[in-house]
Regions:
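Nucleic acid-machinery interaction/catalytic patches
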Residues: 1-209
């Protein structure tokens, strides 16, 4: 499967949800100490932690610029709190949220390094690391010369999956067989063919249609 391929390129195993949450809390508590912020206890962090993992996973899955996104989220929260009286109960609550959002980028960095040290990852991080490592693996001939990959049955890819496939295609080490129904592909009004129509415009992928 493509998940196994991503794991082989990234060198990271798949972390279990509870394990990832526990490691995320360690990164959170450590980041709080560095930033002189009082950390929430684990039981109050747990739900936030689940949402954070989901957000980090989406960012990495799409190879989105994590620093830009997370710092923008903090800035948006800061602007939204301008009108509040920070001495009021609502203001104090909002101030706590703002402190948390200001931690997101350093927390993401610490968590990433912690997971790499532990040789595990969530799906999105494994994909991002695989994309970062693949060019070097190819340059160093770490992938046997006779190895060839055939990707079949896809009609939508994450940003990381797309980048991996494009890199392998450019090196003539892969082909792709799309799960493409002409009815959905040729009709711009058919939402089911949205991603396939995008791939058809991609110079690395269009000759497989």
């Amino acid at each position: 499967t493509i998940d196994k391929l991503v794991a082989s390129f990234s060198g990271l195993g798949k972390g279990e949800p509870l394990e990832l949450l526990a490691l995320l809390y360690l990164s959170y508590a450590g980041t709080c100490r560095k930033e002189n912020v009082e950390p929430r206890p684990p039981d109050r962090f747990w739900e936030w932690g689940k949402m954070l993992l989901s957000d980090f996973n989406q960012i990495d899955n799409q190879l989105a610029p994590a620093q830009d996104i997370l710092q923008y989220m903090a800035e948006e929260k800061r602007i939204g709190s301008w009108h509040l009286d920070l001495g009021s109960s609502q203001g104090k609550l909002q101030s706590g949220y703002l402190a948390f959002y200001n931690l997101l980028w350093p927390l993401y960095q610490d968590f990433r390094q912690r997971l790499i040290h532990e040789n595990i990852a969530y799906t999105g991080l494994a994909g991002r690391i695989a994309c970062e490592r693949l060019p070097r693996l190819l340059q160093e001939n770490a992938i046997p010369r006779q190895t060839f990959y055939l990707f079949a049955g896809f009609n939508a890819l994450t940003g990381a999956e797309k980048q991996l496939i494009k890199t392998l295609v450019r090196e003539k080490k892969a082909e792709i067989i799309w799960n493409a129904d002409r009815y959905y592909l040729d009709d711009d009004m058919q939402e089911a063919g949205h991603f396939l129509r995008q791939y058809k415009q991609d110079p690395d992928l269009n000759h497989f249609f």
